[in-house]
């Protein structure tokens, strides 16, 4: 939200007042202090109760925030974000969050149950090999001598993701899953395996999780005796180490050696998350420890796969109704691909987008109704929500004015809203159909999704005959996902075509218009299959078919032509990007700049820019007049930093000071200054209009202050003993 | 695709600037001017003057501040949604953040940590937070009518226990949290990885929300991806204030106040005055020798011993050594070997400074 600059507050705001008072001066030098305690209103959980009731009086329909009211409220008391808006955000976001969690859980469930089966089977085999008596089991002797009895059963879970962040949740889920199956589970992370606390630290951590949270000794016999208590021994003990590569190798090796000594008495299963390669443990563990491991490998799905699944569930299946514009999607994609690469950050980006949407768009609270499952909710309830003010705001939306919808079509609004709510369905079906087709070319849903949101795309041009020839002749269409889909279509083998048709049929089942078209393809498919069988080569790809296959080729050609026609039909009829629909602003977040600045702070660039272009931020009259020349009225640090730009990687303090002084002392008064420079007592004000030379001491003090401020921002390094007259520049260019 | 190109372009610009600057340094010889060529005023006066510097553009700055005031409600909304706020941009943000806290966060308890101070004990902060929270929860239970459990005292507990208490389950409404304001989360006392880990764990607690400010351009390097995405959960806000770093800068030395002759002579005099008269006299012998032999590397230790013994300032080599150790500790004297391999003592001050120092001592 850009500061409007029209605020009634006088300049002497409380910031400066509180800053100077003696009370805060004392607080400034305390390491920490309590600024204030919560006012009693919060204790009842009615945070904005006062505001809410106030609104009730003002507005006949408190359910919706009116724009005009909103504006006045914003100016009056800043309570722009009502409890209602917060509530709706909570509803919407928790829905999205839950969807994502479910998707991730599903994507891991196979691996999880695999791990559990492995634990069960191995546990049973250990038990059957020979149960120990209680007294034997809690003693550290007799020392077991058979090599096989010292093996520690280990599951290596390959995360296929270098970033650990995404897998934290995975391992938490795994912990819950195994606990629900009756296992005793403890989770350790690299923090527990520090060289500082040694193996004792992680043993303590284990005992705290297994036995009781107040244990403060590291003794593995406690674990053994605990295991024999109260039927604990009926279930296996599982230890999860989620980021093996980051653990301190020797400590982890020690733990493995200790636990393996007790392997028979306490059947322990070690689950190690490995993100780099399956031989990673070889690099960090000692040979002794490695010999004790009896490893089994499990592999999780890759981040890109999970990403596509999340995308599908959040945007293409009915979820919260919240969606993003083409530009935002492109930004999220490039952030995922170029900057971070973790699903966690993608989800965070989505949450920030959602938050920004709610804080920018007053009508966003209507999303609440999209969250509910019923389709026709709005028709009844929706109309009564529409107050005069909402209507005004709604009809001022750019998408509405662009489509020349006026107030005369007042009654149409519920219809449009209903359409919005229904709209994604055929659209998302088409996107998913394209995704199915694109899978043969290893296309990512993320790419398709980004392209398909483009409101200016003209897909149909790909179907013109010249374009088809073009696309076959050269490879320019790399960025163009839909063109790639169409091209790949012509290279598909009959079996691939038939599997694609099957998935299309399933996808379109709820939508008869498309479904009919898909079913119409069946006869062609049968013809292709028949032709293929006649040739005895039902699965050979088209390319390698011999000349004698001309019949099959002909049928295939007819088939692919037909499929292309169906795709054309789908694109033409249903591929209306959300941004071309009237009233889409209610559910579509579009402000990519806001998202970017909130997500990616750029202190390195921005702080330098602040200094180099200070007058743009301060909007002062005095400094912005004359282009690039330095004026004495500018901020001192800003002058100094601009001067620093002219120096090499080190700056001579003397020269720097002299040029700083030259700027501060205007040329006209320089002659006068020379005669007076000894009089230090004259401390004169420097005013923009009539700059008068400040005293030497003041210039020096201001120089010191400015250098200190540059040092705080980390833009320069102070003089060293070796180079006492120079400071070093740290940042070059913004 | 465009983004990738932009990034590449930025990186190209950055490296070009860097090499240009390096080239500039190599091609033209570095300026040989010395700081001592400037007539630097006394440190005392410098500090006094520094405190009287008038703020430029104070009108524009306070306008900027009141512009930010319009965003307070948005910030509260973001805090309630579970994000942490990270303020950056040039200028002290202390006043801004505290004003925000006292104006808009009245419904929540607010604890301020001054990260710019050289030492902050995070354990004590956690204790204070835990006590605040238990108070808050007690009030809540009372008002909702349920029985309050007996609370143990916190000081005996470990950091982990306190953190897990702060991360307790949210009862009913999600709005029960304490707001922690951290000025300069990149400050000297908090810059070590352990403090940052603790702060990250604190910020991920369900009953805690963080509002922090950074000033250093490289502050984000303090955090790894887990801290950024899972724990701090920052929302960045670019809020340059151009306000002077009054409190934040207190612990930084003044660049012009180091190494000036007057300054070192003065500090040396202060040190010497705290020594015994015999110690002072030994130093005087050394100083006079250095003044009369300006071309030599220094006074040989043996010569100093015999000269001091003659005048009954020291009785043995041991006493002389104890004086010398004292001098060396305060950097009043340095040892060197001259061309003959003799150990020589040298006062690392200019002749002028030594003369000044002798004058001060004789007063």
From Swiss-Prot, chain A:
Compartments (UniProt record)? Nucleus
- Which factors induce or repress this protein, as stated in its UniProt record? Regulated by E2F. Accumulates rapidly after cell cycle reactivation by sucrose addition following cell cycle arrest mediated by sucrose deprivation.
| This protein's UniProt keywords | DNA replication, DNA-binding, Nucleus
Q: Which CDD domains match?
A: Orc3
Q: Name one GO molecular function term.
A: DNA binding
Record flagged with keyword Nucleus: yes
Superkingdom classification of source: Eukaryota
Q: Name one Pfam family in it.
A: ORC_WH_C
GO CC terms: nuclear origin of replication recognition complex; origin recognition complex
**UniProt record, GO biological process:** DNA replication; lateral root development; response to sucrose
Q: Where is the composition biased (Polar residues)?
A: 12-24
Provide the free-text tissue specificity comment from this protein's UniProt record.
Follow a cell-cycle regulation with a peak at the G1/S-phase. Mostly expressed in siliques and flowers, and, to a lower exent, in flower buds, leaves, roots and stems.
Tell me the segments the record calls region Disordered.
1-25, 532-554
The protein's role, per its UniProt record: Component of the origin recognition complex (ORC) that binds origins of replication. DNA-binding is ATP-dependent. The specific DNA sequences that define origins of replication have not been identified yet.
Family stated for the protein in its record = Belongs to the ORC3 family.
Q: How does it assemble?
A: Component of the origin recognition complex (ORC) composed of at least ORC1 (ORC1A or ORC1B), ORC2, ORC3, ORC4, ORC5 and ORC6. ORC is regulated in a cell-cycle and development dependent manner. It is sequentially assembled at the exit from anaphase of mitosis and disassembled as cells enter S phase. Interacts directly with ORC1A, ORC2, ORC4, ORC5 and ORC6.
Protein name stated in the entry: Origin of replication complex subunit 3
Give the source species: Arabidopsis thaliana
Q: Which lineage ranks, top first, belong to the organism behind this chain?
A: Eukaryota, Viridiplantae, Streptophyta, Embryophyta, Tracheophyta
From Swiss-Prot, chain B:
Q: Where in the cell is it found?
A: Nucleus
Specify the signal sequence span: none
What is the documented disruption phenotype for this protein? Zygotic lethal mutant phenotype. Seeds abort early, with embryos made of up to eight cells, characterized by enlarged nuclei in endosperm with arrested cell cycle. These phenotypes are partly suppressed by mutation in MEA/MEDEA.
The tissues in which it is expressed are: Expressed in female gametophyte and embryos, and, at low levels, in trichomes, pollen and the mesophyll of leaves. Follow a cell-cycle regulation with a peak at the G1/S-phase. Mostly expressed in siliques, flowers, flower buds and leaves, and, to a lower exent, in roots and stems.
Q: Cross-referenced Pfam families, in alphabetical order? A: RecA-like_ORC2, WHD_ORC2
Species of provenance = Arabidopsis thaliana
InterPro entries linked to this entry: ORC2, RecA-like_ORC2, WHD_ORC2
Highest taxon of source: Eukaryota
In which broad location class does this protein mainly occur, judging by the first location in its UniProt entry? nucleus
Stated name of the protein: Origin of replication complex subunit 2
Example GO biological process term?
DNA replication
């Amino acid at each position: 939200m850009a500061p409007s600059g029209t605020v009634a507050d006088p300049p002497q705001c409380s910031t400066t007042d509180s800053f100077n008072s003696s009370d805060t001066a004392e607080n400034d030098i305390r390491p920490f202090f309590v600024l204030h305690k919560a006012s009693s209103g919060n204790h009842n959980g009615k945070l904005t109760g006062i505001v809410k009731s106030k609104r009730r009086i003002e507005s006949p329909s408190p359910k919706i925030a009116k724009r005009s009211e909103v504006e006045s409220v914003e100016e009056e008391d800043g309570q722009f974000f009502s409890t209602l808006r917060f509530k709706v955000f909570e509803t919407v976001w928790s829905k999205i969050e839950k969807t994502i969690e479910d998707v991730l859980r599903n994507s891991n469930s196979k691996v999880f149950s695999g791990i559990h089966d492995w634990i069960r089977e191995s546990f049973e085999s250990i038990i059957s090999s020979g149960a120990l008596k209680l007294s034997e089991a809690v003693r550290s002797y007799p020392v077991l001598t058979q090599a096989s009895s010292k093996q520690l059963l280990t599951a290596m879970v390959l995360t296929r993701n270098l970033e650990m962040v995404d897998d934290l949740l995975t391992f938490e889920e795994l912990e819950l899953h195994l606990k629900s199956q009756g296992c005793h589970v403890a989770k350790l992370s690299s923090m527990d395996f520090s060289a500082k606390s040694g193996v004792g630290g992680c043993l303590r951590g284990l005992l705290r999780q297994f036995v009781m949270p107040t244990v403060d000794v590291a003794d593995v016999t406690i674990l053994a005796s605990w295991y024999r208590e109260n039927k604990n021994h009926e279930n296996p003990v599982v230890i999860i180490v989620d980021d093996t590569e980051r653990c301190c190798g020797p400590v982890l090796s020690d733990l493995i050696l200790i636990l393996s000594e007790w392997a028979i008495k306490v059947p322990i299963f070690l689950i190690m998350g490995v993100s780099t390669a399956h031989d990673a443990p070889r690099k960090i563990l000692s040979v002794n420890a490695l010999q004790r491991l009896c490893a089994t490998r499990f592999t999780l799905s890759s981040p890109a796969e999970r990403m596509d699944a999340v995308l599908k569930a959040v945007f293409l299946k009915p979820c919260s109704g919240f969606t993003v514009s083409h530009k935002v999607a492109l930004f999220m994609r490039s952030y995922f691909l170029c900057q971070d690469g973790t699903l966690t950050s993608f989800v965070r980006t989505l949450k920030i987008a959602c938050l920004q949407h709610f804080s920018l768009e007053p009508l966003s609270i209507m999303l609440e109704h999209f969250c509910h499952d019923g389709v026709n909710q709005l028709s009844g309830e929706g109309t009564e929500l529409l107050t005069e003010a909402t209507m005004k705001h709604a009809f001022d939306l750019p998408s509405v004015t662009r489509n020349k919808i006026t107030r005369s079509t007042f009654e149409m609004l519920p219809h449009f809203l209903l359409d919005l709510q229904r709209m994604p369905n055929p659209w998302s079906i088409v996107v998913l159909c394209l995704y199915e087709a694109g899978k043969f070319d290893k296309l990512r849903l993320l790419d398709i999704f980004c392209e398909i949101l483009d409101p200016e795309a003209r897909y149909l041009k790909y179907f013109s005959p010249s374009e088809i020839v073009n696309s076959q002749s050269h490879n320019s269409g790399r960025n163009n996902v839909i063109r790639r889909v169409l091209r790949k279509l012509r290279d598909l083998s009959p079996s691939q075509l038939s599997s694609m048709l099957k998935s299309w049929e399933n996808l379109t089942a709820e939508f008869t218009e498309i479904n009919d078209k898909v079913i119409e393809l069946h006869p062609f498919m049968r013809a292709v299959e028949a032709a293929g069988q006649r040739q005895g080569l039902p699965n050979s790809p088209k390319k390698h078919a011999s000349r004698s296959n001309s019949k099959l080729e002909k049928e295939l050609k007819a088939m692919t032509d037909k499929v292309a026609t169906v795709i054309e039909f789908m694109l033409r009829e249903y591929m209306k990007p959300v941004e071309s629909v009237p009233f889409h602003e209610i559910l579509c977040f579009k402000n990519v700049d806001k998202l970017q600045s909130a997500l990616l702070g750029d202190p390195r660039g921005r702080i330098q820019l602040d200094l180099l272009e200070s007058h743009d931020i301060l909007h002062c009259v005095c400094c912005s007049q004359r282009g690039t020349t330095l004026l004495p009225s500018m901020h001192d640090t800003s002058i100094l930093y601009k001067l620093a730009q002219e120096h090499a990687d080190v700056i001579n303090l003397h020269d720097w000071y002299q040029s700083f002084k030259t700027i501060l002392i205007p040329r006209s008064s320089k002659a006068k200054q020379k005669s007076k420079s000894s009089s230090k007592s004259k401390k004169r004000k420097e005013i923009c209009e009539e700059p008068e030379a400040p005293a030497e001491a003041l210039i020096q003090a201001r120089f010191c202050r400015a250098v200190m401020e540059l040092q705080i921002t980390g833009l320069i390094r102070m003089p060293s003993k070796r180079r006492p007259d120079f400071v070093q520049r740290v940042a070059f260019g913004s | 695709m465009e983004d990738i190109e932009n990034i590449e372009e930025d990186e190209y610009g950055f490296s070009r600037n860097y090499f240009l600057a390096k080239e500039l340094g190599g091609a033209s010889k570095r300026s040989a001017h010395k700081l001592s060529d400037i007539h630097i005023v006394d440190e005392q006066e410098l500090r006094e003057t520094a405190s009287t510097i008038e703020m430029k553009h104070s009108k524009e700055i306070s306008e900027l501040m009141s512009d930010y005031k319009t965003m307070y409600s948005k910030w509260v909304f973001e805090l309630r949604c579970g994000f942490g706020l990270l303020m950056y941009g040039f200028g002290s943000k202390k006043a801004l953040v505290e004003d925000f806290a006292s104006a808009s966060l009245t419904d929540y308890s607010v604890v301020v940590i001054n990260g710019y101070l050289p030492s902050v004990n995070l354990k004590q902060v956690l204790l204070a937070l835990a006590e605040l929270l238990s108070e808050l929860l007690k009030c809540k239970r009372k008002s909702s009518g349920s029985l309050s459990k007996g609370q143990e005292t916190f000081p005996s507990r470990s950091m982990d226990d306190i953190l897990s208490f702060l991360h307790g389950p949210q009862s009913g409404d999600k709005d029960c949290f304490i707001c922690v304001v951290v000025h300069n989360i990149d400050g000297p006392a908090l810059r070590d990885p352990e403090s940052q880990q603790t702060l990250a764990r604190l910020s991920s607690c369900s009953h805690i929300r963080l509002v922090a400010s950074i000033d250093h351009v490289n502050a984000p390097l303090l955090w790894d991806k887990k801290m950024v995405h899972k724990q701090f959960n920052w929302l960045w806000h670019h809020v340059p204030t151009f306000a002077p770093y009054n409190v934040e800068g207190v612990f930084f030395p003044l660049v012009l106040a180091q190494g000036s002759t007057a300054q070192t002579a003065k500090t040396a005099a202060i040190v010497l005055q705290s020594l015994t008269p015999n110690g002072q006299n030994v130093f005087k012998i050394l100083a006079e020798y250095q003044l009369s032999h300006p071309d030599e590397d220094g006074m040989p230790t043996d010569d100093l011993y015999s000269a001091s013994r003659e005048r009954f300032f020291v009785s043995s080599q041991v006493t002389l050594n104890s004086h010398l150790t004292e001098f060396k500790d305060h950097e009043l004297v340095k040892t060197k070997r001259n061309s003959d391999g003799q150990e020589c003592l040298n006062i690392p001050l200019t002749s002028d400074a030594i003369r000044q120092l002798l004058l001060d001592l004789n007063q």
